[in-house]
From Swiss-Prot:
Keyword annotations: Cell inner membrane, Cell membrane, Ion channel, Ion transport, Membrane, Metal-binding, Sodium, Transmembrane, Transmembrane helix, Transport
Gene that encodes it: fluC
Name of a matching Pfam family: CRCB
Gene Ontology CC terms: plasma membrane
GO molecular function: fluoride channel activity; metal ion binding
Membrane topology: Multi-pass membrane protein
The protein's role, per its UniProt record: Fluoride-specific ion channel. Important for reducing fluoride concentration in the cell, thus reducing its toxicity.
Originating species: Saccharophagus degradans (strain 2-40 / ATCC 43961 / DSM 17024)
InterPro entries assigned to the protein according to its UniProt record, in alphabetical order: FluC (IPR003691)
Gene Ontology terms: biological process: cellular detoxification of fluoride
Predominant place of localization: membrane
Protein name per its UniProtKB record: Fluoride-specific ion channel FluC
Family to which the UniProt record says this protein belongs: Belongs to the fluoride channel Fluc/FEX (TC 1.A.43) family.
Localization (cell): Cell inner membrane
Length: 133
């Protein structure tokens, strides 16, 4: 027995896939841009997490609160693009590697920076966007 997938459901799956592919490419581009620096502190991951959190705040207001874009854009941008662009798993493994290699001070500062800056970025983005749109 074959069940047909509703067209709207298929469109949402494709929206997430498109956004996810673009987000993954953007994430990889940031990694390449920071690669020559050879820093002990994982700046690329911190950058995408904070920037992604800021953008999540902006698009939360624009798409969810104000409905300024069609709902499908939530799937493209928030779920697909920003879901692939930001990276909790890389953040986790980098934190563990820093700790295991004896750089526990860097590991702790990295964890604190990611959490505090990312949450702050969402808050600032929401407040600013609500005032501007």
């Amino acid at each position: 027995m074959t069940s047909a997938v509703p067209a709207t459901s298929l469109i949402l799956w494709l929206a997430v896939a498109l956004g996810g592919a673009l987000g993954a490419l953007a994430r990889y581009s940031v990694s390449i841009a920071w690669m020559p620096a050879q820093l002990k502190f994982p700046v690329a991951t911190l950058t995408v997490n904070v920037l992604g959190s800021f953008l999540m705040g902006v698009f939360y207001v624009v798409i969810v609160e104000k409905a300024m874009l069609a709902p499908v854009w939530r799937h493209v941008i928030m779920i697909g693009f920003l879901g692939a662009f930001t990276t909790f798993s890389t953040f986790s493994i980098e934190s563990l590697h820093l700790w295991q290699s004896g750089h526990w001070q860097i590991a702790i500062s990295y964890v604190v920076a990611n959490v505090v800056l990312s949450i702050s970025a969402v808050v600032v983005a929401i407040v600013l966007t609500e005032k501007l749109v």
